[in-house]
Every structure is written in structure tokens, then in C-alpha cells.
From Swiss-Prot:
Belongs to the methyltransferase superfamily. RlmI family. SMART domains: PUA. It catalyses: cytidine(1962) in 23S rRNA + S-adenosyl-L-methionine = 5-methylcytidine(1962) in 23S rRNA + S-adenosyl-L-homocysteine + H(+). The gene is rlmI. One of its GO terms (molecular function) is rRNA (cytosine) methyltransferase activity. Coiled coil: none annotated. Its EC number is 2.1.1.191. It is found in: Cytoplasm. Residues 2-79 form the PUA domain. The keyword Cytoplasm applies. InterPro entries: PUA (IPR002478), PUA-like_sf (IPR015947), PUA_sf (IPR036974), RLMI (IPR023542), RlmI-like_PUA (IPR041532), SAM-dep_methyl-trfase (IPR019614), SAM-dependent_MTases_sf (IPR029063). Specifically methylates the cytosine at position 1962 (m5C1962) of 23S rRNA. This is Ribosomal RNA large subunit methyltransferase I. One of its GO terms (cellular component) is cytoplasm.
């Protein structure tokens, strides 16, 4: 008999709208003794069936829903269908842009909560962030090996969010033979080196693909400051688009070494490129004090808020860094600024940048609103999937 999670009165509304999370404070009682990751049925207080998901006893999100179809069992065939659907949903994009690197599975937005899978050429990188995902690891690896027989499979489940599930970090080869690092992928006709072992996240920020191409429209014959550059790909696009000068700034010497490599693998000279291993916040203040200016500035900082308690501090951080960046822009210059925090609403982010402009005593115009690339879809019932917000602002 299925283990049953009964909700408190009135707490069924989000599931009836197909939001895939059940929080611990919504649960009335539990019929049975589920193990971590085990499949459970969720019912409303009056007993009517709502969904079927994975039990996570140590998390605030105690059930992540796999399916809202009562007839659908959670088994090997379920995961095979979900993986196939995810690939089909990306095939047009892959053909159109000639991609060899893309997000294959975007967790909740692809109906696979806690499961992220990125493809870099012939390497699949899995990030399993929930007890349910962890429980089905072997099945996922078997299916991926069948559906992508030429690919190695590597795990990068080494993020802090696993602690909230009571899970330890896990990394390593799951299937096949890993090629020598870095792997070279291609997007929009540009080659990019990716280290899936030592790189950020699963190795690279695939979600900024479209925004890199948009940024390239503003850089011809311009001076570009690329902040938090990681492996320098905004700068790489700028170099190919004819920027007069580029400064790539990051605290990581390893990331900057890969930025140099990216120029080389694309056959581009970096005579006009400066690689600066520095703290961006300190450097921007230094440049302001020195009176240094740029035509284009890219701000792509790491996440400032991991939870709601940190949001106010994040707002202050975003305002401060955008204010200083605007002070460094030449008249008519362009700022491309981003927030990758899912807790930051797009309208609030725009207000923060507008307030930063007031403090910087600069008049700005918002000329583009940016988001994540389309291989990072946003489920209609899962607004949390809309995490990357960006703005292009021209300053006068």
C-alpha cells in the first residue's frame, strides 16, 4: 500500500496548480514510514489525491512531486519518458544554433525535481540535489548510457543545497571514459573550453548564451570591462565582434587561464585583452577614484541571496555595485547587469538599477530585458525557474 502524506486544510491549492513542492509546515500527518527518497502519495485534508513524489525528511521541502497523473508510476519507464521529452524539447534549438553544449534537464521545469543534466560535447554532467534524485541515480545513469552511448557521464553533486537534504557532496565518473580536460563546446560559432571537474557549477554558465550574443552588438570599437568574467566568454564574444579593448576581471587565476585559452582556440589575438585577477568590488572603487572610464561594462556577479533572509543585503549589494559601474561609464555607454538569484523579482532588480542610477547621478534608459537561454525553460507552475534576470541600460 502506498505511503500517504495528508496535508493540512487549505494547503492543497499550490499542488492543484501543479507547483511541485510540499513544505513541511503544510503536512498534517503521514501514513507509513517512508525512507529518504521513497515515492509517496500526497492527498488533501479531505482525502482527494493530489500528486506523487519523493520524500525528503530533512528538508523544508519534504515532498518534491514527480507526477500529477495518478495512473503514472514512478519507475524506470517514467524517467526514460522524462529524459526523452527533455531532449525533444531542445532539438530545434540545437539545430538552429549548432550547439554542442546545452542544458538537457532543468530540474523542476522539466518535471524532474532535483535533477540537472548538462551536455558538454560527449560528456553529460549530472547534478543531483534531492533525496529522490539521489535514490534514482543508478537508473538515471543506465538510461543516459542507453540514450547517449557515445557520452561519458560525470557527477557534480557538490553544492551546498545538498546539505539541506541531509546529503553529502558527491563527485566523480559514473560511466564511460572522461576525455582530457577541458572539453571544447561550440555555440553561435564560438568555441568554449569547459572543465567539468574543476569548473563552476557543472563546468560552465550555459544560461548566458543568448546574452553573450546580445552583448556583442554593443562593443564594436568600444572599451569593454567584463566583471566577474569567469572564463571570459562575454569578453570572447566582444573580441570576435571587434571591441577596441577588453579587460576581463575575476578573482580566480584558473578561470582567467581558461579565458586566455578561449581566445587561442578561436584563433583570436589577445593583444588588446587585459586579464586582471582582482576583487571586482575593490577594483571598481579604485577605477572610480582614478577617473578611469569604459564604453561597455558587464556585471555578472555570483548569487547574492541564497534565502529570503539575505534578500535585503543582496539588494544593497546590487545597488552599490551598479552605482559604481554607472559612474565608470562614458556618456552613451552601455551597462549589461545581471542577477542570478531566483529570490530576486525582475521588477525589483530593475528598481534597484534605477535607484543606483539616481545615486550615481546618471540618466539611464533600459533598452533590453534579458533572461536565461531557452534550454533553461521555466515551468508555468514553477516561477522559481525564472532565476536569471538581466538588463541592458544606456547611460548619459
Amino acid at each position: 500500500m502506498a505511503i500517504r502524506i495528508k496535508l493540512k486544510p487549505g494547503r492543497e491549492k499550490s499542488l492543484e496548480r501543479r507547483h511541485p513542492w510540499v513544505f513541511s509546515n503544510a503536512i498534517h500527518n503521514i501514513k507509513g514510514k517512508p525512507e529518504a527518497g521513497e515515492t509517496v502519495d500526497v492527498v488533501a485534508h479531505d482525502g482527494h489525491w493530489l500528486g506523487r513524489g519523493a520524500w525528503s525528511p530533512e528538508s523544508q521541502i519534504q515532498v518534491r512531486i514527480w507526477t500529477f497523473d495518478r495512473e503514472e508510476e514512478i519507475d524506470r519507464e517514467f524517467f526514460a519518458r522524462r529524459l526523452q521529452r527533455a531532449q525533444i524539447g531542445r532539438n530545434d534549438l540545437i539545430r538552429e544554433q549548432g550547439l554542442t553544449g546545452y542544458r538537457l534537464v532543468a530540474a523542476e521545469s522539466d518535471g524532474l525535481p532535483g535533477i540537472t543534466i548538462d551536455r558538454y560535447a560527449n560528456v553529460l554532467v549530472c547534478q543531483l540535489l534531492s533525496t529522490g534524485a539521489d535514490l534514482w541515480r543508478d537508473t538515471l545513469v543506465e538510461l543516459l548510457a542507453e540514450q547517449y552511448p557515445d557520452c561519458a557521464i560525470y557527477e557534480r553533486s557538490d553544492v551546498d543545497s545538498r546539505k539541506k537534504e541531509g546529503l553529502l557532496p558527491v563527485t566523480g565518473l559514473l560511466h564511460g571514459t572522461l576525455p582530457e580536460m577541458p572539453v571544447i563546446i561550440e555555440e553561435n560559432g564560438i568555441k568554449i573550453a569547459v572543465d567539468v571537474i574543476k569548473g563552476h557549477k557543472t563546468g560552465f554558465y550555459l544560461d548566458q548564451r543568448d546574452n553573450r550574443a546580445i552583448a556583442a552588438r554593443f562593443v564594436k570599437d568600444k572599451s569593454v570591462l567584463n566583471c566577474f568574467c569567469y572564463t571570459g566568454t562575454f569578453g570572447l564574444y566582444a573580441a570576435k565582434a571587434g571591441a577596441a579593448s577588453i579587460e576581463n576581471v575575476d578573482v580566480s587565476s584558473l578561470a582567467l587561464a581558461t579565458a586566455r585559452l578561449n581566445m587561442q582556440v578561436n584563433g583570436l589575438s589577445d593583444d588588446n585583452v587585459h586579464y586582471n585577477e582582482a576583487d571586482v568590488f575593490k577594483l571598481l572603487r579604485q577605477y572610480r577614484d582614478e577617473g578611469k572610464t569604459f564604453d561597455v561594462i558587464v556585471l555578472d556577479p555570483p548569487k547574492f541571496a541564497d534565502n529570503k533572509a539575505q534578500l535585503n543585503g543582496a539588494c544593497r549589494g546590487y545597488k552599490d555595485i551598479n552605482m559604481i559601474a554607472l559612474q565608470l561609464l562614458n556618456p552613451g555607454g552601455v551597462l549589461l547587469t545581471f542577477s542570478c538569484s531566483g529570490l530576486m523579482p525582475a521588477d525589483l532588480f530593475q528598481k534597484i538599477v534605477a535607484d543606483a542610477a539616481l545615486d550615481a547621478k546618471r540618466e539611464i534608459q533600459f533598452i533590453e530585458r534579458l533572461s536565461q537561454a531557452s534550454d533553461h525553460p521555466i515551468g508555468s507552475a514553477f516561477p522559481e525557474g525564472f532565476y536569471l534576470k538581466g538588463l541592458v541600460a544606456r547611460a548619459w
